[in-house]
Amino acid sequence: MILTNSKFISLSALIAVAIAAPVTSAKTFKMALGDAAGGTQWELGTKFSELMEKKTNGSVKLDLFPNGQLGNEQDTVNNAAIGLLDFSVLAINNVTPFSPSVGLLTMPYLIQSAEEAKKLTQGAVGDELVKNTIRDANVRIVGWAYSGFRVLTNSKRPVKTLEDLKGLVIRVPKNDIMISAYQAWGINPTPMAWSETFTGLQQGVVDGQDNPYITVHAMKFNEVQKYITNIRYIFSIEPLIVSESIFQEQSKDIQEAILSAGKEATEYSYQFLLESEDRIRKDLVAKGMVITEPADGEKEWISKVTKEVWPKFYASIGGKEKLDNTLKSLGR
């Protein structure tokens, strides 16, 4: 074969680059985030990335893709399950369709404080759910983000009672437990993909939604929502998952780094919530949002859900005994 001068120069350049390249180069993983930068998912992801780079002496790096750039949250579970995506941080309710027992953590009014959320996820309950997601979905939970209680927001009016809720069109995730909660409260919610939610609120397709204060702030929902009802029906927990196939392909050292970084990032996320939620709540008020407390300590909301919704999902979470034992572990 005869090489022209230009081809010879190009080939020489490639050889030079190959010779100059280090013997080992950093391994780069992709991490999907459903939320915008600045929220709980971003904080967990960036801390995990920093820790991984430190623990592996720079041999592992992570690229973060916020705002659903790599697909909606349920897509990321599916893609991780088949080895097309490395990591994802997502709302726990979007793991439930793939591993139903995880729905335990979204049973309305089960978790009543950040401390209880931490106790469940980092104790025996969390350990069992990790095993279940590996078995059911081929993804491994290696960390947890804590976002706080999902509060109700809307653009129409203050909501104190279930009567006030009637007539509002509320967006919910495509999650049977959450849909059933609103049905028990007397309305038919509108399931909508997370990536469509801001636009749906902006255009008036839906009147409201529910999410933690931190998420409301990060997604700038204050620009399209006026009223907040401080309900506490679900404590938002967002697991950090890794593809089990990809995890098993790694060396023992990298596996240990992933697990260790996940634990440390989890604790960081918990402290981030405790230190930032009140500040963020005040900032939302300063930006014009109005916070209303539900009437009578939320008793009507709680009664409807625990009587009508809990029994419907006993089987999927592992039985009524599973829920009873979880409540006992929390001292209730």
Question: Where is each model-derived feature located?
Answer:
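Bacterial N-terminal signal peptides that target proteins for export
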Residues: 1-11
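N-terminal secretory/targeting leader peptides
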Residues: 27-116, 125, 129-332
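Sec/Tat signal peptide C-region and signal peptidase I cleavage site
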Residues: 19-26
